[in-house]
């Protein structure tokens, strides 16, 4: 016999998780080795914002990453999970600006650039560790000594190196072009930071008089121009029509007089114009509209910028040529009464002035999308500004080919199309931002306006042989955050130095990210990496071999989680639990829109009337893995979280059954393995195969389901029960067989589940390892189970599968006939094959114990059975004699109900098959299936009627 141990009744995650994690980290289990002969496996984490906190999307993606990292570590690979945080320029600057405004009533300008940046570093030091601590709570097996920040010295050097090299290659340039301008934050922003909001607006129809006596085809001396933006009229430099629009073909090349400004502008033909929109004539304002900007370039139109950086009307128009340089040969004056007007006040005045001049044709309601800055919260303005750009086309060609050639795989594959659609129509990338927080652009200016690009001011002076007394001013702008994060996979490994880590772990293996940043981050990483990182043969390296694109975690109603909706769930609250009061405070405190607080509080009280219970990290991780389907949207499900917490307890209780069993015998001596022992080993190996196959395809949901199904349905519900008769009445050899199988399968199951459920599996494994004769420190460095083909036993699976069906049939009869589970029954079977007869004989004791049977008897085909309740298991008839058990009235009532149900099904199928439309449209296989079901129901009805007759005759 083996000394059993004590185990608590329930798994207490709060007592285990943080202590275990601390131990793992202190022991260095998360660190890679320096052994270059081991195959390496590396994942670079998408760096979360340094001042942020974990949300469910982070928890979701990081659970999947850690599952892969732990699996590969157990596979014997040298694993590195490279972590770090992003400086998140605009987001972090805004957080600190709001903080000093609220606490001190100051702006960043009161501080000045240097002092304000120091303030951000202080804030980063204070709050920057939050997200790292939360990641530890998730169980992430990260080498924290390698944690990086995008503004660390090493990464900053990599950023400068890339900028300087691209500039030297002529791929970075400075130019005046149109950008998304946030007039509140005073910075250019990326397309990702623009949110298009549906709005009910107007379409104004203005009359532009034709110049020089020209007339339209129907005799009018004006064109009616449709616009949604009257405030930009003063910047018009043309009107456009479609070249094939017969209404206006005769006017192409002629001019109109621009009202209010009184200057002539040409009528141009361009296929961009939609003939069905408005009147088919549109104004072209290249300095204030992205589409017009492209039209202007095609037709060589000047660009007239009429707005200041605040989006007010300028005192004097800025006139730029298509080459981006000031144009002195074109005149465009702004009337005095417009100068200084705020843009929407200018809109009203333009409309009023057109009306006063008799040039307002009509105003129509119009649904439109208005672009807003997602952080400034005001409509963005397309604005002509001096910015730095990367000419990305040459980089994009190489990056596109890498995916076309299969060097990089997208999973699911359809996301390749999204990638290609962007890469094949890529525009130059505006990389400068008018912020203070970020990587300052490594460019310097002298008083004459000359620009010098280098890694430092010292290098500028040396490179260009500049005198020490020549004043140089560094560019005020910083780089787009995506520029530095685009270098993430290689800058974190020490590039531009050729470090051993870069050699060992690059390219990384998989990137796990959301579909929303394929353009903004994934594509740029591929472009930058392939341009700057080469293998020993000079071939461009990819940053990762696979991009696994996850869906978006939404709330239970399918809504996106957001602070303004008040439906954000904190993963730490899923782990530790939270009271209703604290949850309300979290959801309604410090809101940008306090008027929503009452509505949010009401919804929260309804959904979480008792707050949220603690579920532990393993239950959270298992839920996230089980939800990880290939869908684009994934709805969170509290019920599943509860279910998987119960699953953790099921695993704990199964382990208690094994390890506290005083009959467990692991002593030396003769061992006999039963059919059930062979069956559970075979089922375990099939589960290992399913898990490995699922994980190889990034189907974490199927991997989790394989573990769940085996643990709950096979190991706990059946195998543990099948061992009880052995421990009660088996031989010593049979008990040893059951004992060894229990411990062996439990230990392997813990290793199988460990990548998804690290804490509970380590806690139990530490108790199991002694029983299993394992001398090792941690489960995470144990080998991951492999499929052992010699343990696959189809015969055992078939036999136990059939025995299970017989037992279930008896249990169902007990339940339906209201017979106590402890009451012994006679068990009769008819229509069995010779093989089935043999199985019954060999497993007589097992069947009796599991189904609580007094006897097992096989009837011949013509042998009459006593009055019995019958069930069909395949073709085999299971009969339980009812003498002394049955309540005649109750049984007849039950049978009547069953007969009615069966007749209802038959009628339903008859109606279906009698429906000509269904029969005409349905595939033949579907019709055949319905007919097959009909036959089954008719056979079942016949048996029920026979049974009814027999009981009625009692």
UniProtKB/Swiss-Prot annotation:
Reaction equation(s) it catalyzes: tRNA(Val) + L-valine + ATP = L-valyl-tRNA(Val) + AMP + diphosphate
Enzyme class, UniProt record, top EC level: ligase
Family annotation (Gene3D superfamilies): HUPs, Isoleucyl-tRNA Synthetase, Domain 1, Valyl-tRNA synthetase, C-terminal domain, Valyl/Leucyl/Isoleucyl-tRNA synthetase, editing domain
Coiled coil: 883-954
Compartment(s) where it occurs, according to its Swiss-Prot or TrEMBL record: Cytoplasm
Keyword ATP-binding: yes
Short motif 'HIGH' region, span: 48-58
InterPro entries reported in the protein's UniProt record: aa-tRNA-synth_I_CS (IPR001412), aa-tRNA-synth_Ia (IPR002300), Anticodon_Ia_Val (IPR033705), M/V/L/I-tRNA-synth_anticd-bd (IPR013155), Rossmann-like_a/b/a_fold (IPR014729), tRNA-bd_arm (IPR010978), tRNAsynth_Ia_anticodon-bd (IPR009080), Val-tRNA_synth_C_sf (IPR037118)
Self-association and partners: Monomer.
Family: Belongs to the class-I aminoacyl-tRNA synthetase family. ValS type 1 subfamily.
Biological role: Catalyzes the attachment of valine to tRNA(Val). As ValRS can inadvertently accommodate and process structurally similar amino acids such as threonine, to avoid such errors, it has a 'posttransfer' editing activity that hydrolyzes mischarged Thr-tRNA(Val) in a tRNA-dependent manner.
Protein name from the UniProt record: Valine--tRNA ligase
Taxonomic lineage: Bacteria, Pseudomonadati, Pseudomonadota, Gammaproteobacteria, Pasteurellales
